[in-house]
Amino acid sequence: MNKVVTLLALTALISGCKTLGEPQLQSSKNQLPDARCVSIYKQPSISAREVEEIRYLSTQYVNCAVVLGLMYEHGHGVAQDFPKARGLYESMVGRDPSVYSRLGAMAENGVGGPVDLVAARDFYQRSVVNPGHADAEFKVAEFLEFGKGGPQDLQGALKYYLSSANGVDGALSGLQRLRSRGVTMTTAQQARYNEIFESDVRYRLRNRALAIEETLKKERMTARDSQPVTVQLEGIPGVPVPTISLVQSSGNSAVDQKVLQGYADYRFPAEPILPPEQKTYWIRSTVMTDGKTDLQRMAELISK
């Protein structure tokens, strides 16, 4: 198997950063080569034998070559050697153009040489010749939005923020900046923007609901037969503070109030693009109040 994952996402995985959609690779004797190389790199120290293992795998697998390049770039397991890191990346771009993103990062940050934003922009743009590399697309969007290493191109930035949004948290903020500057969108782009907005809000609300569920457990306010609480958050364009109302009660007013309090400081991170006749928008969020985990609920459903 020589399936190539997004190289910037691979770097984020190695460093422990969160990126939506990243594979969660775990160390095991039966790992696929890409996963094996990443798991070795994530170790606090790398043995000489493991270095040789990665060196061998790097001759066959692009991502293992990138890992070896990162080892030289950061001096992890081997002596730091920027030319070797750059050489490894350059040797792989013919097999996978997304590796250009590593060369872009080196040029942008002045690794192994002076900062060169013109070269960084060129490398990043080369890295997104094939779609599906969200982190690299986000970098291109930033360079185009702010005119780094070349002329400003807001429509180009819009294109790449829209394509990177499923994998990068900051894309929605970039889209909001472009909207505030009056950048126009096609009907299809508006629909895509609204999908991104809804996905982001649902993700944030799900995390908020999980936090509230933990609070209920800690304060012993859960009961096995308690009903879920559903709230509605209604927004008005230009006003980030939602109007929050109770849609479904748990049957316990104290629990309901605790849930409502948990949403009290929530703010919409952006706003959707509404048709002229629509003045408000809303979304619902549900908090489980039975004190069970998702696995426990699933097991109960299976046993029925």
Go through the PLM ranges and name each one:
Residues 152-169:
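TPR/TPR-like (Sel1-like) alpha-helical repeat modules
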Residues 43, 60-61, 72-78, 95, ...:
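Glycine-centered coil turns and helix-coil junctions that link the paired helices
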Residues 172-180, 188-192, 210-214, 236, ...:
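Conserved "boundary/linchpin" sites in short secondary-structure elements
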Residues 112-115, 149-152, 179-206:
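Alpha-helical linker/edge segments of TPR/alpha-solenoid repeat scaffolds
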Residues 40, 65-74, 100-109, 123, ...:
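Hydrophobic face of amphipathic alpha-helices that form TPR/SEL1-like repeat modules
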Residues 52-55, 89, 124, 161:
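Hydrophobic/aromatic packing residues within the alpha-helices of TPR/SEL1-like helical repeat arrays
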Residues 17-67:
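N-terminal leader/linker segments that initiate helical-solenoid repeat arrays
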